[in-house]
Amino acid sequence: QLANKGYFIRVIVRNPNEALFLRIYGKVGQIELISGDVKEENNLPAYINGSGCVINCAATFFETPSQSFKNLHINAARNLAKAAKEGQVGQFIHISSLGASPKSDSQLLKSKGEGEQAVLECFPKANIIRPSLIFGSEDTFFNRFARLSSISPFIPVVGSCTKFQPVYVDDVAKAISSLVEDDQHERYLDLGGDETYTFKELILILLSEIKRK
């Protein structure tokens, strides 16, 4: 979306080799891949130097020792927003999650809510986008469970009645592009699809699509 509108894009990734496919979405030299980690506060100013807008997409569904909810959703978000403010970046867009709240019983959504607060403390005019479960060709959620189903005779379904409104990745990208293009600030956008599904229903749809029972 942004590349098609002529923007030059700098993407910070831990392993640029795994993100080489992103370059095909722009012209030669339009999309730059930089090896880095948003959790490393001291390096952030160099990553965003000269940028007109910073978009924070860093997130995880599943915690690991090196990628905890606190480190990624709260600390990294705070550090990036702080670096953007100090670097006089004009616009900051933070990707959160639908249902994010510091009071949530879900550790994921709680960390997302606290991450929003951390961003706004450092960059008060930040835009907050709260998408529901995002699906697309390389999404984390569905691809992870698809891989699990291929190696396991069963899939554990915890919280099977939890409801989602899956939203297509292109629709989220269009919303982000619109904020950048119109230079909007202090906007809160909740994004969800037209249909509501339980977690169990989503898993059953997934199994049907990959021809598993």
Indicate where each model-derived feature is located:
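Residues in the short beta-alpha loop(s) of Rossmann-like NAD(P)-binding domains
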Residues: N15-P16, E195
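N-terminal Rossmann NAD(P)H-binding glycine-rich loop of SDR-like oxidoreductase domains
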Residues: Q1-I12
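Conserved Rossmann-fold NAD(P)-dependent oxidoreductase catalytic core, especially the SDR/UDP-sugar
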Residues: F8, T60-F61, S66-G136
